[in-house]
């Protein structure tokens, strides 16, 4: 039986055992509704995506089928199917079934399927354990308040993985900006994040759109991130 079928059987058994799941709709406050209507649909959808459910799994066994890799969390029996669309497709073409990976999952689409479908973001587990964080990187946020002035705030961004994907980095940085700097409360215009490495190389995330799918599986060395700069316009 394939891994996917085993996982679905486990999920079905769980539903039969626990019974139906019910949800209760919560009213939206007038102030929240006003905030949501102040931006375009595209910006609203960006905020919804970057504040949506995400899952950070460690040391899961992967099983490859074509350009997809399947993982099942042994505790919750949750099936995760990762679509390879970029450099990870070539990198993992000779992957051996049962290899251990860390997996960062963000559900894609609006399906209510019990399976978590995601794109990219498979990386090697850390080579050793760390008591605290692996690295604290300086995060500088410059926010434009008028045509000739801006506020600047500095803080730290925690790096916990030796090998980290652009998908995870982009998602967690945007979530921090939403929580602490009102990202997507207004239109992001040409706002961007720049991640600079020790050797001068850099990676840019444009905040007026999602990270491109072909970049989601790209991984970089988390130990060599020098600084992160954000421009909010």
Could you tell me what each predicted segment is?
Residues 6-11, 41, 50, 227:
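N-terminal functional modules and adjacent low-complexity/disordered segments of proteins
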Residues 173-233:
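C-terminal, beta-strand-rich globular interaction domains
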Residues 72-88, 132-198:
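Mature extracytoplasmic domains of secretory-pathway proteins
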Residues 27-109:
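N-terminal, intrinsically disordered, polar/charged segments of Gram-positive cell-envelope systems
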Residues 100-147:
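Surface-exposed, polar helix/loop patches in the mature regions of secreted/periplasmic/lumenal proteins
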Residues 48, 59, 71-73, 83-86, ...:
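Surface-exposed beta-strand edges and flanking loops
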Residues 1-30:
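Sec-dependent N-terminal signal peptides of Gram-positive bacterial secreted proteins and lipoproteins
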Residues 92, 96-100, 109-112, 197-203, ...:
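Exposed regions on extracellular, virion, or secretory-pathway luminal proteins
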